[in-house]
Amino acid sequence: MAKLQLNRIKAVLAEKSVSSKDLAQQLKRTESTVSRWSTNEVQPSVETLYEIAKFLDVDIRELLVSTKLP
């Protein structure tokens, strides 16, 4: 069964050319935690999603659903 992709953190990091290490340092979290978010193994809290969006300078919705046209 395919794993549900509940967040787009990995994709947005790539779009912004930001490493997971940079995000981990900014949020004072481990790289392992960011990796688990990026692979949708676990989900960050809404508050953490807000912090990620602020750091990446994107609308929080970008982290959940692609708003780009195909």
Predicted features along the sequence, with ranges:
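Alpha-helical residues within the helix-turn-helix
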Residues: 14, 25, 54
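Key DNA-contact positions within bacterial/archaeal DNA-binding proteins
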Residues: 21, 32, 61
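DNA major-groove recognition helix of helix-turn-helix
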Residues: 38, 56, 64-67
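A short, Lys/Arg-rich alpha-helix, primarily the initiator
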Residues: 1-19
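Recognition helix of helix-turn-helix/homeodomain-like DNA-binding domains
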Residues: 29-44
